Amino acid sequence: KMNSSSVQKQLKAAGIDTNSKKYKAALSEMMKNGNGAMFTNVQAIKNLMSQYDKNGDWIDPNTGLTGLAVTDENRNSYKHIISIPESSREEMFELAKKEFLNENGTLNGDTTKRESVYNNLYRKMDKDDRLSAGWTMEQYEHQYRQAFAEAAKVEDPTWRAGKPIPAGALDGITRESVESGRKSVDIKL
């Protein structure tokens, strides 16, 4: 048992503060994964504790940031639009446009650089806003790609994803025009 005096002595001897939020978060994760029946050792506990900060928040191994875990507590509350930096929206707009042109309107998970745009955004946001910021960025990204597809269809009504984008089709589209609801697409007569 984790709370037996002999186990507690071993943990303390190993330098583990059993009152810390970090320890409690690791123990909670172990209990959840082990359904309460745990067979473990001190090193396994230390390894798991290294995945949490002093506040007991999970540290994303790719970014080193907290606030990026979807949990039972936040699962239904992070999907709302929040204010995100204009520089991040601009970075996503430029990348989405470049990738839309390079991939003929398809999404290519092998070549995209989207993750770096999201990671840059997360670094600019407070921990408690990171999930909502990511969700907000997804909404902007979808809006940008939709505007690009509509512009390609204005130039060539038969265009569909995978076909070459008509030359100049995206030239008149700005991030500001998409975000304000105006696509700023000139229709050639």
Question: Residue locations for each model-derived region?
Answer:
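Type III/flagellar secretion export determinants
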Residues: 1-189
